[in-house]
């Protein structure tokens, strides 16, 4: 299955409305998948400074920061995100990204939220308004493209 997460008024969701995607690797053991996924994560993150954490072969947590990933007006917004991977024999479950977006404009912090909310509340913006209507189409598309590509690249495992 390809990870095709979309941003909805409730955050990132898969095509069925869930918060995960499952990648099948028939015949591969958990230890093999853990090693391959760990290597893929570390290779793909060259040039950035991600935090990578796993205390066993069951789960990997990756946190990363991408500066100026998207723009709100003239302000480049930094994305801080978490990707989580549950590993089992023959499959890896990738959970929807958890993303915080922030930036600075005229010396003040700007926050952009994925979920529904007021469109303007001081310097806080939302991709969807409180009725669930899309307000930031370009930002939504850029974020979806970035994270779907990121996950697809991470799941290109070499054994």
Predicted regions and their residues:
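Ser/Thr-rich, low-complexity intrinsically disordered terminal regions
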Residues: 3-159
